[in-house]
Design a protein with these regions (language model features):
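Beta-strand-enriched cores of mature, soluble protein domains
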Residues: 21-167
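Composition-driven detection of intrinsically disordered, low-complexity segments
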Residues: 7-9, 25
Length: 167
């Protein structure tokens, strides 16, 4: 009986530690202007090219500019996309993130995307391969707002946050 209780306590403690080690989160907010060029291919089918420029801010004090380009396709109400964004922080380091629409369409109020850090310099090299989630909201006059979040370990977030660019 003592052995079972010990195993159970070790199991609970391990789950607690794992939960604590992956409890950190980085958030990215972006705001800017976007443009769509639309082909009405056929009834129920649209092909759009997408581009945007804007600013981004994070919850860890990193800011910069973002530029995105890609395609969006809508076939009988189902939206797919492939959008690549280049983020450049104030110190010159860049990262690329690739976005895929998971829910919603560009004609609705918002879309939810999955995105992944596919390339990065400096602090961003630490999270290449990280998969995250974001939400895009179109605004009036070709404006947009976007918010993304990425779950990661506390240690990884601390390394990203405290990164010092070599001289």
């Amino acid at each position: 009986m003592k052995k079972k209780i010990t195993i159970l306590l070790v199991f609970i403690f391990t789950i607690f530690l794992i939960g604590k080690s992956f409890s950190a989160q980085i958030t990215i907010d972006a705001y800017g202007m976007d443009k769509y060029f639309n082909y009405d291919v056929d009834k129920g089918r649209q092909f759009l090219t997408y581009s945007s420029e804007g600013l981004f801010v994070t919850n860890i004090g990193i800011n910069g500019v973002v530029e995105c380009k890609g395609i969006v396709e809508i076939i009988t109400g189902i939206t797919s996309s492939n959008i690549m964004c280049k983020y450049a922080e104030d110190n010159g380091d860049i990262f690329f993130a690739q976005f895929f629409i998971k829910r919603g369409t560009v004609s609705e109020d918002a879309t939810v995307q999955s995105f992944e850090f596919v390339s990065g310099e400096g602090r961003w090299a630490e999270i290449v391969g990280q998969k995250c989630i974001g939400a895009y909201t179109p605004m009036a006059q070709e404006r947009f707002m976007w918010k993304g979040k990425c779950e990661m370990s506390n240690k990884t977030l601390e390394r990203v946050k405290n990164y010092k660019k070599p001289d």
